[in-house]
Amino acid sequence: MEGLNNAAMLGSNMIIIVNDNDQSIAENHGGLYKGLKELRDTNGESPDNIFKAMGLEYYYLGDGHDVSALIKLFTSVKDIDRAVVLHIHTIKGKGLKYAEENKEYWHAGGPFHIEDGSPKGPGWPVNETVRESV
């Protein structure tokens, strides 16, 4: 937060990307989550905008999987002379049904077979093994 707080004062071309996939390792709680959700729900138009409150310019993109829209957004800010936040909404596991339906399981993992999501090799990394054993 300190970096964001000072970014507006630098007067430099800084592009800050917030990849908002509405996800943490478990259920989301807290003020930052609520603020990002409100921005998503209002297509970035909420008057309660933590980034604007810090003096940062703010842009919202509701479909972070639209490559043309991403290129247009980045092109529009690449030469700007101040710090900007690009709040880009994405879907964790987009395009892989098994990943979209089980986001927590797919939050991190190892190599897998794209056809069915089964792991390649001996198994998942230690973090998966620990999570399942708890």
Predicted regions and their residues:
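Glycine-rich ThDP/TPP pyrophosphate-binding loop and its adjacent helix/strand module
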Residues: 1-133
